[in-house]
UniProtKB/Swiss-Prot annotation:
Organism: Thermotoga maritima (strain ATCC 43589 / DSM 3109 / JCM 10099 / NBRC 100826 / MSB8)
EC category name: ligase
Protein name: tRNA(Ile)-lysidine synthase
Biological process annotations from GO: tRNA modification
Domains as described in the record: The N-terminal region contains the highly conserved SGGXDS motif, predicted to be a P-loop motif involved in ATP binding.
Amino acid sequence: MLEEGEHVLVAVSGGIDSMTLLYVLRKFSPLLKIKITAAHLDHRIRESSRRDREFVERICRQWNIPVETSEVDVPSLWKDSGKTLEEIAREVRYDFLKRTAKKVGASKIALAHHKNDLLETVVHRLIRGTGPLGLACISPKREEFIRPFLVFKRSEIEEYARKNNVPYVVDETNYNVKYTRNFIRHRIVPLMKELNPTVEDAVYRLVSVTHLLRNFVERTVQDFVERNVYFYKDYAVFVEPEDLFLFLEVTRWVLKEMYGRVPEYEKLIGTLKSKRVELWSGIFVERSFGYVAVGKTVFKKKYRVEVKGDMLEMEGFKIRVVNNRNDMKFWVRNRKEGDRIIVNGRERKLKDVFIEKKVPTFYRDRVPLLVDEEDRVLWVPGIARSDFLPEDVVVELLEYPVGYVKGGTYFEQV
């Protein structure tokens, strides 16, 4: 967790947990051969917050510890944010800690979370709604953040603080149950402890195992993504995994990579009942013929381009057209309602051809079709060549999105 010679930034609110952490790291810093700096952020949520800041500064002077302080008007940021006050405060606090660590040259940021914090977070997530991996919520070490006290209960930290006369201030809002975290701490956890006095230890073991599970899932998903996920301009496509949980996690990974957010599991599970589910405005998950498309899968744009050169590229397709006829002109467009193609004297609806050849639904409106001056469909890439397309006109499909031509590069003629 800590290595010799490291500089550690200690997040200090002034409360008993963080003050005890600062006391312990100061006491053992000569033995560990580490340098420590304290960091305190005034959120301006309480009238007494200035008192806390002055207290931290005074104790740090007494203990000869460098301290970095700042203040942010969190209530102002909270207005119209759509988030809870606790969420905004947390975001602001972590941003402050990261910036301060960079400023002072600290390689680690120490936080005073303990087993009771872990228990409260698990209960909070269960109430709010979370997936199984959401229980892997607070880890002893993640990126630059470390939590040396995570193996201790709040009662153990408080007992140590009393024995060593660690100074601290009391945040009066910690007892206000209008805040979700406090309600859990003062109303729900005591009931849980009536059923199991060591519930903190039980949850700690659960979360520890869940961290191992999450690490395994993350490696599995990363391996799948590297081998199977293809990103295009505004969507991604991959082979649908046979395992439902892997499908959910890969889809969530892709969405987070593309949009920085993930939907609830329930919405993704909905894709198993409906082939297309809209997650957010214009953002879909669509399953078709063994492939999954994520993103802006619904293609509404209409295009029509005259063929003037040999090569054309559009919507992930690359085609080559060699027109040896001076008396004919050709265009490339995407499909429209009622399109048909005649092959070997038989007229077929283009829609039926796509279904027969198992072209995923999310590609059908993107496919570049070769048409003549009468707007007749003469060629469908990799699928069909019309009787009306002269033999001395060469057309080739050179590149196409993954899964468009299933199982090969060219189908037999329909």
